[in-house]
């Protein structure tokens, strides 16, 4: 089968061998813009590439791309199915919105974490903001809210508060609050990706992605992070690598599952 394609670049006409990307070769058509990454010059005639990014100007969202990895299998068609599927408002989605609000307020609000009264006041204010921001969404829920939901909200706040207070500034994570950025957005023309991280150090060397849902479990026992979440974090690291020439090993990344709470590196 076909193992190479020709292209015009700043270095003239090139013949690129990519035998490991046969599916990509079937998609290519004349005049299609591509980014060619990881090119190796084996000799004057033969060049190989690690990756070929098709139509990089069409920026794909990292979260949407990672969501193509389903528990029942992986498929690129899932991207289009998710785009046309009706958007539902569910309790897990609202819990995720609340977790993001708690994270924002705990990082940005000057508060003595050892002062229980001040922390409780912050929780009430943060919860009030969350409900005011999501009044319409809550009115569209199919299921009524009960006491267990509010218990979960309070537990989520406590878990995030404890992690922001103790885990973030630790040497392991490396996120002192004074140098922490919330929800920075990036585009990466090289990879054709766009995305918004949850938490990042100002020096780009530490990332935390907040997850309010479940990690991988087996009969109630934690097994590790979900595959699609690992892919999401890996793509964020690749964006930093190509945008800022950051060595991959210099970026620490963590998936923070607030319901447990647990950090996965």
Spans of model-derived segments:
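Short, amphipathic alpha-helical segments that act as regulatory/interfacial helices
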Residues: 96-107, 237, 241
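Hydrophobic (often cysteine-bearing) scaffold residues that line and stabilize catalytic clefts
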Residues: 91, 95, 149, 228-232
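A non-catalytic, helix-rich entry segment at domain boundaries
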Residues: 102-182
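Extended, charge-rich, solvent-exposed interface segments
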Residues: 47-95, 101
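Structural detector for short beta-strands of small beta-barrel domains
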Residues: 1-3
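A residue-level signal for conserved active-site and pocket-lining positions in enzyme catalytic cores
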Residues: 71, 99-100, 199, 236
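Flexible glycine-rich surface loops and low-complexity tracts that mediate binding to linear polymers
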Residues: 24-50
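Mg2+/Mn2+-dependent nuclease catalytic core
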Residues: 7-30, 34, 175-265
